[in-house]
Amino acid sequence: MAEEAGTSKKPKKYTGILLHPTSLPGPYGIGELGAGAYRFIDFLERSGLNTWQVLPLGHTGFGDSPYQPFSAFAGQPLIISLDHLKELHLLYDEDFRDMPAWNAEQINYGELIEFKTGLLKLAYSRFHDESLSDGIHDDPEMKQAYDNFCETSVWLEDYALFMAGKDYHQGMPWYMWEDNLKKPTKKQKETWVKKLDTEMGYYKFIQFLFYYEWTTLKKYANDKGISIVGDIPIFMAWDSVDVWANQSLFQLDSKGYPTVVAGVPPDYFSATGQLWGNPLYNWKKHTETGYEWWLNRIRYQLTLCDFLRIDHFRGFDKYWAIPYGEETAINGKWVEAPGVNFFTQLEATLGYHLPIIAEDLGEIDDSVIELRDKFGLPGMKVLQFAFENPEENDFLPHNFVRNCVCY
């Protein structure tokens, strides 16, 4: 792989493990950013490995998929370390008396979300209790870090209002809200912020906890010579803060409904293709804004990781646009995307070689390969695919190109 972001290190080989934090061992239903994560980093170091790859770390929405987050920026509150909150005296042992008996084989996310959300809200109430004099209340450095996070995270206000708005509407998607919040004017937005101020504070608090814990963990890994490989989906969920707050950047009608949605055409694996349903980008508008939203997204993600895998890389070259309302992906069409222009702008803005891994699996044509190679981005090789048609198979190790990542 190419050199790390912002460093002058020569390219070297990286070897590691792909393991999402939720799969780490721990006592609270799923893995967290606590002791289990630190032990895993120690294990990587002892094993002579230098890379930890994770799935997208976003705040998951419907279906609990990391590839359908509520936000391109917000982190997953379910992996906040509850033991860390004990250390901050925001939670106590007696708060865990009614903890469910977790199934070691399968996660009941409904039960998990109810349990952890209750504890996070309890921690938030204590965070604002000035009568407490221990833990975080006796740590000016932690309080300053919280204030700095809230001041510098330009995405945080919209995220907090969006999530508080969803709670206010019992989880209803934003495109079914009343007009003064679905497409609010500046004044209407200010009114809702005042109305939902306390609820918004909770979401800012949990995002600070996630960011603080994850960046502390990342520093621990980096200090031991372990690089973090992050991951993001190319498209955003329809019911996400990014679509709600930036409707002109997506192909939506006047009511907030997509005119076309994402997917892939029919192929060897599916006679009807794949209908993902994500709203597609209005690339003309992104180009007019200098790709500001995308640049902010990539820049922020690179504070959380050293390399970044982007799912469905081919969508930067051409994307499959399916008319909204179709039941399959058959009636879509390929539409050009501004791949070269976009990555040129991204590279110029970052000021160094892009530390991006291109997920280039599936039906890939020459123009996708040219885009990938023009910017020196490593593609992916999957050994599991190596033994179909072994005479001519790019996934066999002796056929690998030099700049690639093998799984």
Label the model's feature ranges.
Residues 1-26, 42:
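Generic start-of-chain signal for non-secretory N-termini
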Residues 2-4, 9, 45, 182, ...:
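Acidic, mature catalytic/reactive cores of soluble proteins
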Residues 6-13, 20, 64-211, 236-407:
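Alpha-amylase-like alpha-glycosidases and glucanotransferases acting on alpha-linked glucans and related
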Residues 17-19, 30-32, 54, 111:
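Active-site-adjacent substrate/metal-binding segments within catalytic domains
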Residues 32-43, 290-300:
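Short, acidic/polar
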Residues 35-60, 304-305:
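Catalytic domains of carbohydrate-active enzymes, especially glycoside hydrolases
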Residues 44, 54, 162, 221, ...:
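Conserved, mostly hydrophobic/aromatic
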Residues 203, 207-236:
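Conserved, well-ordered alpha-helix/loop/beta-strand core segments that scaffold catalytic motifs
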